[in-house]
């Protein structure tokens, strides 16, 4: 864990149920978002402890348990919530994400593998999923962010949208295209899929997972290839490997416009 910052913590500030896991362990800051702190606990096979505002990790706990049931990841050990904070303790999935040099050094294979794993996820049965209305939740977040002028046009560079107003108008005209017919990761990016020598091991960071529109994952799959590899040249290859017959360009553009306000 040499690339992570080691932390000194006061165990007494954590819920008593976590003390045994935290005791005598090296703790590292593995956070990647301002919304939550993630601690890596270097003990046994490794644990991750996610800490965020009260009730904000409930959905991730539900979907983490569901993905374990579907053999798509490991479940959580404990989910604790009080008036001010949530704590979600999870086991580390053994392996590395797509950002490991083994994968980044072979971008064509990475692209194809990323698409194949997404198609595998999207073909799963979802009848007993606890989150069946991701599209409605997604659009609600868009409306909230639009109302406070929280926007970023970088997400529509490929879609000939030049202004915030154009993006919002497109959403208003096309939002009924979004479906709830596919099990999603919701944040399908290279850091969130764990592999062992190219073999799929599991999905992590499932706070946006649920049943929604496949084009959300397709959008983020194409985006992460550009962002993490540094070129957009694998975009078409990714869509081809996933299956062009299952891609609606209007819904893909709609998701891009939604992410302007994401």
From Swiss-Prot:
Pfam families the record matches: APH
Transit peptide as UniProt keyword: no
Keywords: Antibiotic resistance, ATP-binding, Kinase, Nucleotide-binding, Transferase
Enzyme class: transferase
GO biological process: response to antibiotic
GO molecular function, one term: kanamycin kinase activity
Positions of transmembrane segments: none
Enzyme Commission identifier(s): 2.7.1.95
Reactions performed catalytically: kanamycin A + ATP = kanamycin 3'-phosphate + ADP + H(+)
Active-site feature positions: 187 (proton acceptor)
InterPro entries: Aminoglycoside_PTrfase, Kan/Strep_kinase, Kinase-like_dom_sf
Protein family according to the UniProt entry: Belongs to the aminoglycoside phosphotransferase family.
Protein's name according to its UniProt entry: Probable aminoglycoside 3'-phosphotransferase
Natural source organism: Lactococcus lactis subsp. lactis (strain IL1403) (Streptococcus lactis)
């Amino acid at each position: 864990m040499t690339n992570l910052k080691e932390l000194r913590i006061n165990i007494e500030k954590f819920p008593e149920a976590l003390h045994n896991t935290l005791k005598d362990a090296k703790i590292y800051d593995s956070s990647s978002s301002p919304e939550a702190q993630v601690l890596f606990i270097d003990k046994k096979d490794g644990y991750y402890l996610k800490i965020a505002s009260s009730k904000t990790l409930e959905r991730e706990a539900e979907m983490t348990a569901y993905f374990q049931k579907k053999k798509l990841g490991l479940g959580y050990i404990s989910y604790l919530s009080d008036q001010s904070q949530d704590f979600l303790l999870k086991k580390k999935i053994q392996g590395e994400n797509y950002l490991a040099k083994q994968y980044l050094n072979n971008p064509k294979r990475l692209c194809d593998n990323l698409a194949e794993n997404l198609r595998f996820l999207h073909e799963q049965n979802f009848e007993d999923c606890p989150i069946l209305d991701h599209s409605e939740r997604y659009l609600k977040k868009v409306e909230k962010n639009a109302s406070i002028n929280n926007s970023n046009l970088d997400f529509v560079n490929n879609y000939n949208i030049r202004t915030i107003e154009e993006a919002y108008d497109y959403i208003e005209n096309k939002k009924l295209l979004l479906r709830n017919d596919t099990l999603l990761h919701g944040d399908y990016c290279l850091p969130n899929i764990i592999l062992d020598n190219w073999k799929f091991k599991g999905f992590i960071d499932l706070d946006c997972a649920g049943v929604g529109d496949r084009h959300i994952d397709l959008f983020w799959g194409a985006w992460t290839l550009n962002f993490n590899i540094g070129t957009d040249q694998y975009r078409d290859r990714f869509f081809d490997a996933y299956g062009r017959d299952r891609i609606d360009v209007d819904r893909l553009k709609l998701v891009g416009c939604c992410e302007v306000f994401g």
